């Protein structure tokens, strides 16, 4: 393939990601103020160890973090987002890699966006960094990427403190020479398959009670109505996937507000989630005869449901 164009406002939107690598974190410092304590921990957690030799960056192969490299796809997003919630403290590492292609040597001004601490390397050379993670707002740092004619490996080494709702988010925005740059991924052999799968998923659209595609679904396409299960016990139950290979449309069940479509091509796995807003309706607790519960009866029902969830998990 000839490479992708930059996304909205010059953002790079095609990456490979490894991680997160998570390990227990402990610090002897103490503070009665929770937010001040977390801010202190973020100020000291980043190690900024030199990346050194990255080796071949291939889908399915292990990175320097001993985590698999994956192609990252999140329809319409300008950022890599692998955020999650941590009930105990963790030291988090994740790596992001992309390739910028140009026909001549140019110095490009870029903006790095992240809540994490990030070291940015261009062809193995450290070009800039965000020194420590933050809770909010997102950080922005401008830096210069010295691009050579041909393929240039851009490598983001990210570190974060995992505590409560943790924003493991990063993005790279090109501010000049936008028309002179194409984007690819380090694993050239997977780039064509990624482009095919992504183009198929981007063509999908909701029409009434159907999900329609511009072309027949490729081999390895399936879908599920599972998206995000708030009940931890139910979340452990494997999702049910239905085959969609060769279909131009999928007839969707009523009462299912979310549908996730997955395409697997070789080692690549891309997913896109669709929300059916009209299917998001209140669920009322009613007696068998259809009458409503009183306030006190409804409150007891809520408490019993909470107790059941906790006992199951």
Language-model features, listed with the residues they occupy:
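Extracellular beta-rich ligand/substrate-recognition surface
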Residues: 83-93, 131-136
